[in-house]
Amino acid sequence: MDAMRITKTTFNDVFSNDANGSIIKVEKYVDKKCASVFEILTYTIIVTNTSRYKTGNIFFKDYISKYIEFINNTVKVNGIIKRGLDPQQGFYIGRIDASCKKIISFKSVVLPNSAHRIIKNSANIYYYYKCNLDKFPTRISIESNRVYTNVNKIVFKQLNISNTLKAPKNLR
């Protein structure tokens, strides 16, 4: 009697019995807690895969406040500049290996309409997660923590630049 034997098994979908799909952690940071009009803020978002499996098709989107404006061509993913990407439109950051992370950063300028205001900012990550092999993947949305920057009324900052020069002896 010829019996069929399984010689190779291939897994196409990553799934888990974690029903809420919380395998991604998102943390957001801003470089300045206090700023003035026309100052540049750098936002950094760390997306960590906390699972044992590689994740794919992760989409990043940032909801930029009306008090700041994104500076074109400042998006970096893991330190590499990604020209043409816009956090407000969103973009794919690709796969994240198990227990690894991707670091996204970008710059924005503080607008004049922001004096005496608090700039609030957060980001979102979207991905598909399958916890049951018999069902379609579920779209998961994870919002980062909010970061805050207080804006001063000061429009210009004073910079003091000093340099001591020694005059040649023949000029004294």
Please place each PLM-identified region on the residue numbering:
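Exported/extracytosolic protein signature
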Residues: 1-172
